[in-house]
Design a protein with these regions (language model features):
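Catalytic or ion-coupling anion/metal-binding cores of large enzyme and transporter domains
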Residues: 1-179
């Protein structure tokens, strides 16, 4: 616009369609990747990774999550019970299957370190060499986080990976169901 290559109306149109609504962007950038991996780690309820911010389903999930916190506390499940080596390896496998942000190579080891778990780039390489990419999401593909949600979300990706033997089935989850 400043260079005079497009009109103010064209700029406004681009602004109106660039980000579909409130919430994170629609591509598999760092925010969406980490949100999906929070679910893959077992620290969020199914659906948390992909439900768009404006869907009423997001409000229902928030209510379920609040109720689930109480159940998790009653069961005595603690974050370190969930954040195990197996959980982090599952998250890396989901990351590879989704083609997530490369920033996970920084964020996941940092979270693992805080949980007392060693997660290295060698782990990423080992898991990446064995895990198929199941989704081609923006920016590397033509599909968006809403499309992943419509296709079953992180849960569907994890189910497919589990069928193929790429996940540790014994990993715990705040849903109180083993993944």
């Amino acid at each position: 616009f400043e260079a005079g290559l497009i009109s103010e109306e064209e700029l406004e149109h681009i602004e109106n369609v660039a980000c579909p609504t409130c919430g994170s962007c629609s591509g598999m950038y760092t925010a969406n990747t980490m949100n999906c991996l929070t679910e893959a780690l077992g620290m969020a309820l199914p659906g948390n990774g992909t439900i768009p911010a404006v869907y009423s389903e997001r409000l229902r999930l928030a209510k379920r999550a609040g109720m689930q916190v109480m159940e998790v506390l009653q069961e005595g499940l603690r974050p370190k019970d969930v954040l195990t080596k197996e959980a982090f390896e599952n998250a890396v496998a989901v990351d590879m299957a989704l083609g997530g942000s490369s920033n996970t190579a920084l964020h996941l080891p940092a979270i693992a370190h805080e949980a007392g778990v060693s997660l290295t780039l060698d782990d990423f390489n080992r898991i990446a060499g064995d895990t198929p990419q199941l989704a081609k999401l923006s920016p590397s593909g033509k599909y968006f986080i809403e499309d992943l949600h419509a296709a079953g979300g992180v849960y569907a990706v994890m189910h497919r990976l589990q069928e193929q033997g790429h996940l540790h089935e014994s990993a715990k989850s705040v849903s109180l169901v083993d993944q």
